[in-house]
């Protein structure tokens, strides 16, 4: 009887421990970007965002390397016609810590990014939080956000290294009263005004711009260009 009670106690403890760990693990979404996980991700295909985007999203420009990295490509299908790449989550996510290991593309007139987004196409207001690399100078990173379509919160940070030369970890902690951006675990910028609140998709893309030379520089048509991503992690509150 004593042995049975002891066994029951140990079993109950083990179950409780497993349950606790599982509950904790359930708040964390981490994915190595080594293959196309169709249950979690989707590829943009066959359309253009228009506006400042001077390219068409193509699923064929979203690929995976032999060493297990997501590779987004910017290519040319014909003279002055460009194809770009976007990879995005099928689910939406809210407040929490968003992290990515990535290596942006380097060239004037282009953007490599990691961000959250939702908008009218999803039946919501336009809320967005950005980590963007302007290819004209990959020794810097730009942070920004939109709340109900209102942006203008750009903050450009000098990194002290060329981001296009290797993988680094970039992150933002999104909370009801603030957004904090990090580079390799070091806090770089904090915003507290008019913080977005609508859950959105996790997105990564590479594209070339038009009509925004003062921001991106003039795109010279160079291609193919590639941005690479190693892993993505989301930790909810």
Curated annotation (Swiss-Prot):
Annotated EC: 3.2.1.73
PROSITE patterns given in the database record: GH16_1, GH16_2
Keywords: Disulfide bond, Glycosidase, Hydrolase, Signal
Known catalytic reactions: Hydrolysis of (1->4)-beta-D-glucosidic linkages in beta-D-glucans containing (1->3)- and (1->4)-bonds
Record domain GH16: where: 28-237
An MF annotation (GO) of this entry: licheninase activity
Biological processes, Gene Ontology terms: carbohydrate metabolic process
Name of the featured protein: Beta-glucanase
Active site: 128, 132
Other remarks on this protein: Beta-glucanases of Bacillus have a substrate range similar to lichenase of germinating barley.
InterPro entries assigned to the protein according to its UniProt record, in alphabetical order: Beta-glucanase/XTH, Beta_glucanase, ConA-like_dom_sf, GH16, GH16_AS
Family: Belongs to the glycosyl hydrolase 16 family.
Bridged cysteine pairs (disulfide): 55-84
Domain of life the protein comes from: Bacteria
Signal peptide: 1-23
């Amino acid at each position: 009887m004593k042995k049975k009670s002891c066994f029951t106690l140990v079993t109950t403890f083990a179950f409780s421990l497993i349950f606790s760990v599982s509950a904790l693990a359930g708040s964390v979404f981490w994915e190595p970007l080594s293959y196309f996980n169709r249950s979690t991700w989707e590829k943009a295909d066959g359309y253009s965002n228009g506006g400042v985007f001077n390219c068409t999203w193509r699923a064929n420009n979203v690929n995976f390397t032999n060493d297990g990295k997501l590779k987004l490509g910017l290519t040319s299908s014909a003279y002055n016609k460009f194809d770009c790449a976007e990879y995005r989550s099928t689910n939406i996510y809210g407040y929490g810590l968003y992290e990515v290991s990535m290596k942006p593309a380097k060239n004037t007139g282009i953007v490599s990014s990691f961000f959250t987004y939702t908008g009218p196409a999803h039946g919501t207001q336009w809320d967005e939080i950005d980590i963007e690399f302007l290819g004209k100078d990959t020794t810097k990173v730009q942070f920004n956000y939109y709340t109900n379509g209102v942006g203008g919160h750009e903050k450009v940070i000098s990194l002290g290294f060329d981001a296009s030369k290797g993988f680094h970890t970039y992150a933002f902690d999104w909370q009801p009263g603030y957004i904090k951006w990090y580079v390799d675990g070091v806090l770089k910028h904090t915003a507290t005004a008019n913080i977005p609140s609508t859950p959105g998709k996790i997105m990564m893309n590479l594209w070339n711009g038009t009509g925004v030379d003062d921001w991106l520089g003039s795109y010279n048509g160079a291609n193919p260009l590639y941005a690479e991503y190693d892993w993505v992690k989301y930790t909810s509150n």
